[in-house]
From Swiss-Prot:
May function in the process of apoptosis. Keywords: Acetylation, Apoptosis, Phosphoprotein. The modification N-acetylalanine is found at residue 2. GO terms for molecular function: acetyltransferase activator activity; beta-tubulin binding; DNA binding; heparin binding. GO terms for cellular component: cytosol; nucleus. It comes from Bos taurus (Bovine). InterPro entries: PDCD5-like, PDCD5-like_sf. The lineage of its organism: Eukaryota, Metazoa, Chordata, Craniata, Vertebrata. The modification N6-acetyllysine is found at residue 63. This is Programmed cell death protein 5.
Amino acid sequence: MAEQELEALRKQRLAELQAKHGDPGDAAQQEAKHREAEMRNSILAQVLDQSARARLSNLALVKPEKTKAVENYLIQMARYGQLSGKVSEQGLIEILEKVSQQTEKKTTVKFNRRKVMDSDEDDDY
């Protein structure tokens, strides 16, 4: 917990220094981003139980873009009243699988063979 508090204090101090020496418009943008992040976190805290939040935060470390998509999906469902109660870890896993299927990327491998002036006749074994 102390590490998180230190990080929060560092961010706050950095924001104060930037506001003091930077553009006032820049500080307003940062404040808006900060408010939006707090709003997102409060909504997610209301719709996810503790184990699901832990899984989502672990996923955020590895795949932030997928986490953002899942968070947006959960927030949208909460705003339209499609969630009944808190989402459990198993429910979050199902949502993650749905998002993975929708955003599945197909990997193609293309071999580029170069023609080299090499003959096998000169090989000495």
